[in-house]
């Protein structure tokens, strides 16, 4: 039976209901600082922790609960006669429940505060108490999540106690929380790209219906610190997002964020099927749609500008899973909401420079994100691209980096007319892209040409300019073909493999 509880919380949500319930069952409540004041002002009978420890709060609140009279009461094993004898001799009363949530370091680390101010939000007393309570979960109930209050109240009402299964789960939540909390602090202090231990701090956002396929369970976790597009978006309409939806939305959003110009990306199965830039949202959607009239069906469409009513009306004509944009005109949103299953996503955060991670069996690969488009751009052929061709070449290179390797993109007037990707050799990717395009002006490749065959194939389809990293031992073969066919070719010096 719970006879004594210690309550010390930063987040006061639900704490009055819990405290008043405990009080109604004659539980003695000990509290600290702001929590003590909050409970007392709201009519809860509460004991200041100083009355228990006989020691005042000190060092600007850094030392409040770090005291044997507190931790002895938490850690004493009730059925250990020696433990109980010691705490009785020392005048220590057992503490049966610990209710603590931590200083909000996750939030404060991203605020415009000085380094020293952020350090002050590293909680010490709270973690020490909850770790102690979690270790002794057979005798102590520990609550760190406001969502657990109601369940614990119900169990006590029904059984006069909290069952051991619940206690164990609550203890597990402590160490789960602390691993994320400590990871955030560690990353803040270390500021290392590749630390000795990789500790990640993510919190479950939602349980997903399933993973890539219906037989796979899944959940979505978001970073506890920082602002990121796939963390801070807002769903304005439609069904719940799926595992595949979120993966696809991420790539579609990253693609349109590559461009300063008005841009649209249509995407299916994590691969762009239509990308375009232009002067208006309606123009770029029309161009992206025309890139691939078939594949866009059931796909995702992303914009880097606000969507207007005219564009929304056109979007509503076909089946789409998601439309994502920085914002939507009110009348545009009304149109899209008529399709109750269409997920309409408002995403204002730009795609961020950071790291990419890939899980393998027994490890995680970590790398810097591919945020560098060009290295040492130079024309390597007798003929140079025109100004418009050069614009299309750069556009093509921005698109091709989001297509699975081997990847080729054929472009005409700011429109990715043909996209070939995921092929095990480059010539197949080129043939796929050229065939899909039908006609095009320039061709972009994510990696160098190992032979002259891609240039030969491009010439057959009337390509006028090519952009590729260069660096093959047979570069001269491709250069020779281009010179013979009157094609200009640009080397960028940087590769964009995507696996």
Curated annotation (Swiss-Prot):
SUPFAM superfamilies listed in its UniProt record: Cytidine deaminase-like (SSF53927), Methylglyoxal synthase-like (SSF52335)
Source taxon at top rank: Bacteria
Family: Belongs to the PurH family.
GO biological process per UniProt: 'de novo' IMP biosynthetic process
Pathway: Purine metabolism; IMP biosynthesis via de novo pathway; 5-formamido-1-(5-phospho-D-ribosyl)imidazole-4-carboxamide from 5-amino-1-(5-phospho-D-ribosyl)imidazole-4-carboxamide (10-formyl THF route): step 1/1; Purine metabolism; IMP biosynthesis via de novo pathway; IMP from 5-formamido-1-(5-phospho-D-ribosyl)imidazole-4-carboxamide: step 1/1
Any single GO CC term annotated in Swiss-Prot or TrEMBL for this entry: cytosol
Protein name in UniProt: Bifunctional purine biosynthesis protein PurH
Residue intervals of the MGS-like domain: 1-144
Taxonomy of the source species: Bacteria, Bacillati, Bacillota, Clostridia, Eubacteriales
UniProt GO molecular function: IMP cyclohydrolase activity; phosphoribosylaminoimidazolecarboxamide formyltransferase activity
InterPro entries xrefs: AICAR_Tfase_dup_dom_sf, Cytidine_deaminase-like, MGS-like_dom, MGS-like_dom_sf, PurH-like
Record keywords: Hydrolase, Multifunctional enzyme, Purine biosynthesis, Transferase
EC number in record: 2.1.2.3, 3.5.4.10
Note on domains (UniProt): The IMP cyclohydrolase activity resides in the N-terminal region.
Catalysis performed (reactions): (6R)-10-formyltetrahydrofolate + 5-amino-1-(5-phospho-beta-D-ribosyl)imidazole-4-carboxamide = 5-formamido-1-(5-phospho-D-ribosyl)imidazole-4-carboxamide + (6S)-5,6,7,8-tetrahydrofolate; IMP + H2O = 5-formamido-1-(5-phospho-D-ribosyl)imidazole-4-carboxamide
Annotated organism of origin: Clostridium botulinum (strain Langeland / NCTC 10281 / Type F)
């Amino acid at each position: 039976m719970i006879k004594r509880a210690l309550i010390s919380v930063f987040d006061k949500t639900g704490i009055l209901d819990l405290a008043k319930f405990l009080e109604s069952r004659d539980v003695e409540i000990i509290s600290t600082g702001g929590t003590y004041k909050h409970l007392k002002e709201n009519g809860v009978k509460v004991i200041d922790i100083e009355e228990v420890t006989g020691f005042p709060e000190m060092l600007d609140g850094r030392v409040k609960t770090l005291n044997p009279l507190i931790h002895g009461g938490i850690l004493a094993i009730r059925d250990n006669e020696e433990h109980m004898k010691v705490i009785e001799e020392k005048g220590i009363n057992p503490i049966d429940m610990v209710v603590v949530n931590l200083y909000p370091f996750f939030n404060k680390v991203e605020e415009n505060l000085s380094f020293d101010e952020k350090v002050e939000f590293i909680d010490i007393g709270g973690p020490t108490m909850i770790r102690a309570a979690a270790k002794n979960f057979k005798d102590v109930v520990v609550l760190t999540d406001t969502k657990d209050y109601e369940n614990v109240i119900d169990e006590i009402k029904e059984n006069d106690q909290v069952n051991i299964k619940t206690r164990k789960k609550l203890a597990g939540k402590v160490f789960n929380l602390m691993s994320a909390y400590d990871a955030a602090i560690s990353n803040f202090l270390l500021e290392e790209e590749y630390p000795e231990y990789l500790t990640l701090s993510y919190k479950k956002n939602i349980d997903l219906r399933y993973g890539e396929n219906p037989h796979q369970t899944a959940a979505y976790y978001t970073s506890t610190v920082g602002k990121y597009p796939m963390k801070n978006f807002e769903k304005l309409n439609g069904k719940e997002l799926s595992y595949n939806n979120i993966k696809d939305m991420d790539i579609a959003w990253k693609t349109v964020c590559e461009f300063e110009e008005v841009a649209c990306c249509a995407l299916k199965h994590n691969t762009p099927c239509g990308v375009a830039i232009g002067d208006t949202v309606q123009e770029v959607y029309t161009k992206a749609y025309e890139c691939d009239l078939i594949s866009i069906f059931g796909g995702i469409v992303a914009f880097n500008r606000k969507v207007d009513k005219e564009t929304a009306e056109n979007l509503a004509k076909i089946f789409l899973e998601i439309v994502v944009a920085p914002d939507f005109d009110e009348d545009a949103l009304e149109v899209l909401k008529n399709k109750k299953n269409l997920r309409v996503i408002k995403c204002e955060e730009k795609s961020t420079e950071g790291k990419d991670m890939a899980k393998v069996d027994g490890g995680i690969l970590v790398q810097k994100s591919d945020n560098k488009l060009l290295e040492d751009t130079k024309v390597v052929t007798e003929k140079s691209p025109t100004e418009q061709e050069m614009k299309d070449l750069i556009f093509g290179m921005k698109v091709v980096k989001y297509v699975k390797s081997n990847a080729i993109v054929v472009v005409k007037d700011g429109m990715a007319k043909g996209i070939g990707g995921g092929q095990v050799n480059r010539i197949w990717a080129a043939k796929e892209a050229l065939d899909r395009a039908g006609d095009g002006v320039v061709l972009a490749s994510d990696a160098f040409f190992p032979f002259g065959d891609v240039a030969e194939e491009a010439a057959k389809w009337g390509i006028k300019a090519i952009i590729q990293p260069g660096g093959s031992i047979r570069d001269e073969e491709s250069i020779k073909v281009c010179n013979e066919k009157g094609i200009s070719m640009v080397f960028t010096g940087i590769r964009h493999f995507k696996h």
